[in-house]
């Protein structure tokens, strides 16, 4: 199992140079529908901090963060502070990890997800615009619509143990922004499984 997870990690971690969205520049705008049928545009959230999370519960790294409830706790903590948190699920319909909107809503309820919305990005348009390569792969956008962080959720690429003991980059970056300060960390290497795009 360890060997399989190591292969997943080594084979799917993206080079920062491959990211389509650049830290320090305006985040790519997008329009996407969530699993309830509501349309979301990034530009609608100007004036708010936005977190994008590349999500697929078929990945053991994602399971690790959600089974521990650490991800839901962070979502609740930050959304209560006015942060917008969007899950981006770019799994194409032909893959076994694909969720219909109905199945996604059940998964949302069963896991107790506390994000703002789950974007049903089956075309991969949002994921590719940001260069999302792994699940999870995190992005933080400031109130001016500028991408200020992209990379891993934390500094511990693991599937066991307590993620709360890791250094959580997303919490750190968002809290810096909320305090009116410049984040110290702006890019890290994301870890996890590959995003299941159609091509």
Regions found by a protein language model. Give the residues of each.
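Positively charged n-region of N-terminal signal peptides that target proteins for export
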Residues: 1-4
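Cleaved targeting-peptide boundary
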Residues: 18-28
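Short active-site neighborhood of thiol/selenol oxidoreductases, capturing the structured segment around
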Residues: 43-63, 174
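Structural microenvironment flanking redox-active thiols in thiol-disulfide oxidoreductases
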Residues: 63-111, 122-129
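Thiol-/selenol-based redox modules, centered on thioredoxin-like
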Residues: 140-199
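Short, internal strand/loop/helix patches
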Residues: 105-142, 147-148
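Bacterial N-terminal signal peptides
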Residues: 7-17
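A short beta-strand-turn-helix
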Residues: 30-50
